[in-house]
Amino acid sequence: VTAAKLRELGVIDGKIATIFHGIDISSREVLNHYTPEYQQLFQRGDMMLPISDLWAGRLKKMGCPGEKITVSRMGVDLARFTRRPVKVPGKPLQIISVARLTEKKGLHVAIEACRQLKARGVDFRYRILGIGPWERRLRTLIEQYELETHVEMPGFKPSHEVKAMLDEADVFLLPSVTGADGDMEGIPVALMEAMAVGIPVVSTLHSGIPELIKSDHSGWLVPENNAMALADRLAAFSDIDQQALEPVL
Protein backbone atom coordinates (compact mmCIF):
# COMPACT_ATOMS: atom_id res chain seq x y z
CA VAL A 1 0.00 0.00 0.00
CA THR A 2 2.78 2.41 0.95
CA ALA A 3 4.74 1.48 -2.17
CA ALA A 4 1.74 2.26 -4.37
CA LYS A 5 1.38 5.68 -2.77
CA LEU A 6 5.11 6.38 -3.13
CA ARG A 7 4.97 5.46 -6.80
CA GLU A 8 2.11 7.90 -7.35
CA LEU A 9 4.25 10.60 -5.73
CA GLY A 10 7.14 9.76 -8.04
CA VAL A 11 9.41 8.66 -5.18
CA ILE A 12 9.80 5.15 -6.60
CA ASP A 13 9.27 3.60 -10.01
CA GLY A 14 8.44 0.16 -11.40
CA LYS A 15 5.68 -2.37 -11.05
CA ILE A 16 4.26 -3.35 -7.66
CA ALA A 17 3.53 -6.96 -6.71
CA THR A 18 2.03 -7.79 -3.31
CA ILE A 19 2.19 -11.19 -1.58
CA PHE A 20 -0.74 -12.31 0.59
CA HIS A 21 0.21 -15.05 3.02
CA GLY A 22 -1.90 -15.60 6.13
CA ILE A 23 -2.72 -13.18 8.94
CA ASP A 24 -2.69 -10.31 6.44
CA ILE A 25 -5.80 -11.70 4.74
CA SER A 26 -7.51 -13.61 7.55
CA SER A 27 -7.27 -11.72 10.86
CA ARG A 28 -10.45 -9.74 11.50
CA GLU A 29 -8.46 -6.94 13.14
CA VAL A 30 -6.15 -6.64 10.13
CA LEU A 31 -9.03 -6.76 7.64
CA ASN A 32 -11.11 -4.23 9.59
CA HIS A 33 -8.15 -1.86 9.70
CA TYR A 34 -6.67 -2.33 6.24
CA THR A 35 -9.54 -3.21 3.89
CA PRO A 36 -9.87 0.40 2.63
CA GLU A 37 -6.13 0.41 1.89
CA TYR A 38 -6.42 -2.99 0.22
CA GLN A 39 -9.18 -1.61 -2.02
CA GLN A 40 -6.83 1.16 -3.12
CA LEU A 41 -4.02 -1.35 -3.62
CA PHE A 42 -6.20 -3.47 -5.89
CA GLN A 43 -6.57 -0.46 -8.17
CA ARG A 44 -3.05 0.96 -7.92
CA GLY A 45 -1.00 -2.24 -7.71
CA ASP A 46 0.03 -4.33 -10.71
CA MET A 47 -0.09 -7.87 -9.36
CA MET A 48 -1.46 -9.67 -6.29
CA LEU A 49 0.35 -12.88 -5.34
CA PRO A 50 -1.69 -14.97 -2.89
CA ILE A 51 0.05 -18.18 -1.83
CA SER A 52 -3.04 -20.36 -2.23
CA ASP A 53 -6.16 -20.75 -4.34
CA LEU A 54 -8.17 -20.07 -1.19
CA TRP A 55 -6.58 -16.66 -0.77
CA ALA A 56 -6.99 -15.93 -4.48
CA GLY A 57 -10.72 -16.48 -4.05
CA ARG A 58 -10.80 -14.23 -1.02
CA LEU A 59 -9.06 -11.43 -2.90
CA LYS A 60 -11.66 -11.66 -5.66
CA LYS A 61 -14.46 -11.46 -3.08
CA MET A 62 -12.78 -8.35 -1.68
CA GLY A 63 -12.97 -6.72 -5.09
CA CYS A 64 -9.58 -7.38 -6.65
CA PRO A 65 -9.77 -7.78 -10.45
CA GLY A 66 -9.12 -11.40 -11.36
CA GLU A 67 -6.60 -10.48 -14.05
CA LYS A 68 -4.33 -9.00 -11.38
CA ILE A 69 -4.26 -12.20 -9.30
CA THR A 70 -1.66 -14.94 -9.75
CA VAL A 71 -1.24 -17.72 -7.18
CA SER A 72 2.43 -17.85 -6.15
CA ARG A 73 3.14 -21.07 -4.29
CA MET A 74 5.63 -21.27 -1.47
CA GLY A 75 8.05 -24.17 -1.41
CA VAL A 76 11.25 -25.58 0.01
CA ASP A 77 14.61 -26.29 -1.60
CA LEU A 78 14.62 -30.08 -1.91
CA ALA A 79 18.41 -30.04 -2.29
CA ARG A 80 18.60 -29.17 1.43
CA PHE A 81 16.77 -32.33 2.48
CA THR A 82 17.67 -36.01 2.47
CA ARG A 83 14.77 -38.44 2.37
CA ARG A 84 14.87 -41.04 5.07
CA PRO A 85 14.00 -44.72 4.57
CA VAL A 86 10.38 -45.70 5.13
CA LYS A 87 9.86 -45.97 8.91
CA VAL A 88 6.98 -48.14 10.08
CA PRO A 89 5.55 -46.83 13.39
CA GLY A 90 7.00 -48.46 16.47
CA LYS A 91 5.81 -48.88 20.03
CA PRO A 92 5.36 -46.35 21.44
CA LEU A 93 4.12 -44.30 18.48
CA GLN A 94 6.43 -41.26 18.27
CA ILE A 95 4.48 -38.09 17.36
CA ILE A 96 6.13 -34.71 16.84
CA SER A 97 5.05 -31.11 16.22
CA VAL A 98 7.43 -28.25 15.44
CA ALA A 99 5.58 -24.95 15.59
CA ARG A 100 5.26 -21.56 17.20
CA LEU A 101 2.96 -22.03 20.18
CA THR A 102 -0.04 -20.00 19.05
CA GLU A 103 -3.75 -20.73 18.84
CA LYS A 104 -3.89 -21.36 15.09
CA LYS A 105 -1.39 -24.23 15.33
CA GLY A 106 -4.13 -26.25 17.04
CA LEU A 107 -1.82 -27.84 19.61
CA HIS A 108 -4.54 -27.65 22.26
CA VAL A 109 -6.62 -29.92 20.02
CA ALA A 110 -3.63 -32.26 19.69
CA ILE A 111 -3.35 -32.49 23.48
CA GLU A 112 -7.07 -33.27 23.76
CA ALA A 113 -6.56 -36.00 21.14
CA CYS A 114 -3.70 -37.34 23.26
CA ARG A 115 -6.04 -37.57 26.24
CA GLN A 116 -8.33 -39.73 24.12
CA LEU A 117 -5.44 -41.87 22.86
CA LYS A 118 -4.35 -42.52 26.44
CA ALA A 119 -7.91 -43.48 27.41
CA ARG A 120 -7.99 -45.97 24.52
CA GLY A 121 -4.75 -47.56 25.64
CA VAL A 122 -2.71 -46.44 22.62
CA ASP A 123 1.02 -46.52 23.38
CA PHE A 124 2.43 -43.15 22.26
CA ARG A 125 4.78 -40.29 23.06
CA TYR A 126 4.26 -36.74 21.78
CA ARG A 127 6.90 -34.01 21.53
CA ILE A 128 5.94 -30.38 20.95
CA LEU A 129 8.95 -28.29 19.92
CA GLY A 130 8.70 -24.51 19.93
CA ILE A 131 7.98 -21.45 22.01
CA GLY A 132 5.20 -18.88 21.94
CA PRO A 133 2.38 -17.16 23.81
CA TRP A 134 0.31 -20.32 24.29
CA GLU A 135 3.05 -22.23 26.13
CA ARG A 136 1.61 -21.85 29.63
CA ARG A 137 -1.88 -22.75 28.43
CA LEU A 138 -0.64 -25.91 26.73
CA ARG A 139 1.40 -26.98 29.76
CA THR A 140 -1.67 -26.49 31.95
CA LEU A 141 -3.70 -28.74 29.65
CA ILE A 142 -1.04 -31.44 29.84
CA GLU A 143 -1.13 -31.29 33.66
CA GLN A 144 -4.93 -31.18 33.74
CA TYR A 145 -5.18 -34.31 31.57
CA GLU A 146 -2.35 -36.04 33.49
CA LEU A 147 -0.33 -36.51 30.31
CA GLU A 148 3.09 -35.66 31.74
CA THR A 149 4.44 -39.14 30.92
CA HIS A 150 3.07 -38.99 27.37
CA VAL A 151 3.50 -35.39 26.19
CA GLU A 152 6.78 -33.47 26.33
CA MET A 153 7.40 -29.78 25.62
CA PRO A 154 11.19 -29.26 25.40
CA GLY A 155 10.81 -25.67 24.17
CA PHE A 156 13.23 -24.20 21.63
CA LYS A 157 15.93 -26.51 20.32
CA PRO A 158 18.82 -25.84 17.90
CA SER A 159 18.37 -27.15 14.38
CA HIS A 160 20.61 -30.21 14.79
CA GLU A 161 18.58 -31.38 17.79
CA VAL A 162 15.32 -30.76 15.95
CA LYS A 163 16.62 -32.85 13.05
CA ALA A 164 17.53 -35.71 15.39
CA MET A 165 14.07 -35.63 16.97
CA LEU A 166 12.42 -35.57 13.55
CA ASP A 167 14.47 -38.62 12.55
CA GLU A 168 13.10 -40.45 15.60
CA ALA A 169 9.49 -39.47 14.89
CA ASP A 170 6.94 -41.75 13.27
CA VAL A 171 4.54 -38.97 12.28
CA PHE A 172 4.54 -35.15 12.04
CA LEU A 173 1.40 -33.54 13.44
CA LEU A 174 0.11 -30.03 12.70
CA PRO A 175 -3.62 -29.77 13.53
CA SER A 176 -4.07 -26.14 12.43
CA VAL A 177 -7.27 -24.27 13.30
CA THR A 178 -8.81 -20.85 12.71
CA GLY A 179 -8.04 -18.58 15.66
CA ALA A 180 -10.72 -16.77 17.64
CA ASP A 181 -9.57 -13.57 15.90
CA GLY A 182 -9.93 -15.16 12.46
CA ASP A 183 -6.18 -15.71 12.03
CA MET A 184 -5.42 -18.63 9.72
CA GLU A 185 -2.43 -20.44 8.29
CA GLY A 186 -1.27 -19.96 4.74
CA ILE A 187 0.28 -23.28 3.74
CA PRO A 188 2.70 -24.19 6.56
CA VAL A 189 6.33 -24.59 5.55
CA ALA A 190 6.80 -27.02 8.46
CA LEU A 191 4.55 -29.50 6.65
CA MET A 192 6.51 -29.07 3.42
CA GLU A 193 9.78 -29.74 5.22
CA ALA A 194 8.45 -32.86 6.94
CA MET A 195 7.15 -34.18 3.63
CA ALA A 196 10.49 -33.39 1.96
CA VAL A 197 12.33 -35.80 4.26
CA GLY A 198 9.66 -38.48 4.07
CA ILE A 199 7.99 -38.10 7.46
CA PRO A 200 4.27 -38.99 7.29
CA VAL A 201 2.10 -35.96 8.05
CA VAL A 202 -1.25 -35.56 9.75
CA SER A 203 -2.94 -32.17 9.53
CA THR A 204 -6.36 -30.57 9.07
CA LEU A 205 -8.78 -29.40 6.42
CA HIS A 206 -7.74 -25.83 7.12
CA SER A 207 -6.89 -22.89 4.86
CA GLY A 208 -4.56 -23.91 2.01
CA ILE A 209 -3.36 -27.16 3.60
CA PRO A 210 -5.58 -29.34 1.35
CA GLU A 211 -3.79 -27.73 -1.62
CA LEU A 212 -0.55 -29.28 -0.31
CA ILE A 213 -1.77 -32.58 1.14
CA LYS A 214 -4.21 -34.88 -0.63
CA SER A 215 -5.68 -36.95 2.17
CA ASP A 216 -4.81 -40.66 2.00
CA HIS A 217 -2.42 -39.96 -0.90
CA SER A 218 0.29 -37.64 0.47
CA GLY A 219 -0.71 -37.52 4.12
CA TRP A 220 -3.87 -37.49 6.21
CA LEU A 221 -6.30 -34.66 6.91
CA VAL A 222 -9.08 -34.42 9.48
CA PRO A 223 -11.60 -31.63 10.15
CA GLU A 224 -10.11 -28.81 12.19
CA ASN A 225 -10.99 -28.53 15.89
CA ASN A 226 -12.01 -32.21 15.97
CA ALA A 227 -9.97 -34.01 18.62
CA MET A 228 -11.89 -37.26 18.21
CA ALA A 229 -11.20 -37.44 14.46
CA LEU A 230 -7.55 -36.62 15.17
CA ALA A 231 -7.31 -39.36 17.79
CA ASP A 232 -8.97 -41.81 15.39
CA ARG A 233 -6.45 -40.95 12.69
CA LEU A 234 -3.42 -41.28 14.97
CA ALA A 235 -4.70 -44.55 16.44
CA ALA A 236 -5.16 -45.96 12.94
CA PHE A 237 -1.71 -44.74 11.94
CA SER A 238 -0.13 -46.51 14.91
CA ASP A 239 -1.09 -49.84 13.31
CA ILE A 240 -0.19 -49.01 9.69
CA ASP A 241 2.13 -51.42 7.88
CA GLN A 242 4.83 -50.68 5.32
CA GLN A 243 2.70 -51.68 2.35
CA ALA A 244 0.02 -49.14 3.30
CA LEU A 245 2.54 -46.46 4.29
CA GLU A 246 4.80 -46.40 1.22
CA PRO A 247 2.25 -44.98 -1.29
CA VAL A 248 1.55 -42.02 1.01
CA LEU A 249 5.21 -41.00 1.14
Segments (PLM) and residue ranges:
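Short alpha-helical donor nucleotide-sugar binding micro-motif in glycosyltransferases
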Residues: 156-157, 164-169
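Conserved donor-binding/catalytic core segment of Leloir-type glycosyltransferases
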Residues: 49, 87-105, 111-114, 127
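Short hydrophobic beta-strand element within catalytic cores of glycosyltransferases
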Residues: 191, 196, 200-203
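Conserved acidic donor-binding segment of nucleotide-sugar-dependent glycosyltransferases
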Residues: 215-216, 220-227, 235-242
